[in-house]
């Protein structure tokens, strides 16, 4: 085990390839046993104390989540980052867009002023931890779609809404155009906010969350055309479809929740009489419509927590979370809804190896994999995020 320095030098951000520029190269960490990695992670946590805040998303592996200070879903983690006070560094055990959001919210002007001008650094243990859904909507595509639809509708009356599972550039787009960010926790409240301010909503990048939420507001499927960014004209729609729309949905989805099917629900109800189906609203409509309960990651956790012993559940969300709920609630019968493994592969990239490597470089004065959003993007993203945080 490496001897810990008696003082912590000021951390310096790296440039270029972080794995090359790091004081401690990544490669030697790959051969360490998990027990050794865990000991070294805890040693750094103890040394840095309140100066370090490790945030973990519920989809993380158990071996990673046990080393986090706070855990939550996208919405909860956004609030945690916004409220950070004493810490100097946030290490985000999640994916890239989450770390971007943490950088924006933790470094709001009022927060920086309260810290006498000091920023909070945000680190992502593995820069390859992205999000396939977020990648389905590039800013150039969204801007092109906005320009195209402006030929047939008044975009001054369109409120753009981006799911928090999106790049900071899309959040900034919403900020510039009077729009807002949403999460699966507050999607309905956000859509209500939007319809108070415009005639239509342009919802991206997850079509399923947008559709499932809008259906609870008496908006019909026919009023929700899907915009395909690769279609030749008008996102694959007629002018009339766009003109008669209430919500224009982006053709994007979560690759995990897309895997769940109505036939999975039917099978469990047939084989396990009395079982309840609990799903995330990122699931397709065919699943969401026939589930007993649909809700955010936070709602899924609370639903299980508040259910009596003996309750039977089949849960349609990320595998690591379902397995953790099963372990934490042995008094209930919990099943994974799909016969196919539905795991967030990019979230899985955050492991003990990368976490230990990140922390020991931080301890010894080097920031690796720092996430820092540029000032212009931060400015407009923050506007959209603050609108979201103000929605009740």
Curated annotation (Swiss-Prot):
UniProt signal peptide: none
Ligand binding (iminosuccinate): 57, 74, 163-165, 184, 280-282, 297
Cofactor: [4Fe-4S] cluster
Region called Disordered, residue ranges: 1-23
SUPFAM superfamilies: NadA-like
Keyword Zinc-finger: no
Family: Belongs to the quinolinate synthase family. Type 3 subfamily.
Protein purpose: Catalyzes the condensation of iminoaspartate with dihydroxyacetone phosphate to form quinolinate.
Protein name listed in UniProt: Quinolinate synthase
Species the sequence originates in: Rhodopirellula baltica (strain DSM 10527 / NCIMB 13988 / SH1)
């Amino acid at each position: 085990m490496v001897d810990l320095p008696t003082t912590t030098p000021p951390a310096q951000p790296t440039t270029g390839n972080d794995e090359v520029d790091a004081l401690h190269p990544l490669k030697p960490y790959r051969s360490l046993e998990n027990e050794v990695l865990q000991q070294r992670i805890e040693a750094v946590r103890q040394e840095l104390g309140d100066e370090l805040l490790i945030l973990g998303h519920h989809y993380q592996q158990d071996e990673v989540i046990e080393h986090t200070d706070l855990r939550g879903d996208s919405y909860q983690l956004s609030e945690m980052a916004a409220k950070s006070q004493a810490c100097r560094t946030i290490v985000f055990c999640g994916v890239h867009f989450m770390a971007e959001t943490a950088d924006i919210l933790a470094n709001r002007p009022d927060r920086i002023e309260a810290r006498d001008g000091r920023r909070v650094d945000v680190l992502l243990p593995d820069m390859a931890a992205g999000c396939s859904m977020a990648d389905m909507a590039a800013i150039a595509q969204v801007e092109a779609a906005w320009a195209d639809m402006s030929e047939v509708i008044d975009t001054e009356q369109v409120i753009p809404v981006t799911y928090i599972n999106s790049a900071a550039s899309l959040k900034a787009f919403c900020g510039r155009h009077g729009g807002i960010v949403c999460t699966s926790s507050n999607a309905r409240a956000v859509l209500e906010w939007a319809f108070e301010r415009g005639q239509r909503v342009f919802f991206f990048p997850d079509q399923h969350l947008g559709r499932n939420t809008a259906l609870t507001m008496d908006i019909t499927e026919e009023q929700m055309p899907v915009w395909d960014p690769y279609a030749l004209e008008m996102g694959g729609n007629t002018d009339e479809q766009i003109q008669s729309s209430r919500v224009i949905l982006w053709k994007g989805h979560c690759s995990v929740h897309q895997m769940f099917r109505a036939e999975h629900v039917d099978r469990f109800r047939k084989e396990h009489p009395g079982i309840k189906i609990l799903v995330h609203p990122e699931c397709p409509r065919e699943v969401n419509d026939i589930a007993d309960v649909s809700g955010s990651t936070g709602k899924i956790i609370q639903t299980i927590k508040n259910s009596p012993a003996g309750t039977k559940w089949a849960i349609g969300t990320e595998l690591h979370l379902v397995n953790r709920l099963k372990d934490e609630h042995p008094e209930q019968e919990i099943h994974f809804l799909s016969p196919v493994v539905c795991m967030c592969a990019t979230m899985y990239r955050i492991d003990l190896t990368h976490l230990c490597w990140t922390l020991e470089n931080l301890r010894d004065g080097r920031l690796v994999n720092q996430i820092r959003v540029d000032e212009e993007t931060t400015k407009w993203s923050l506007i959209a995020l603050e609108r979201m945080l103000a929605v009740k």
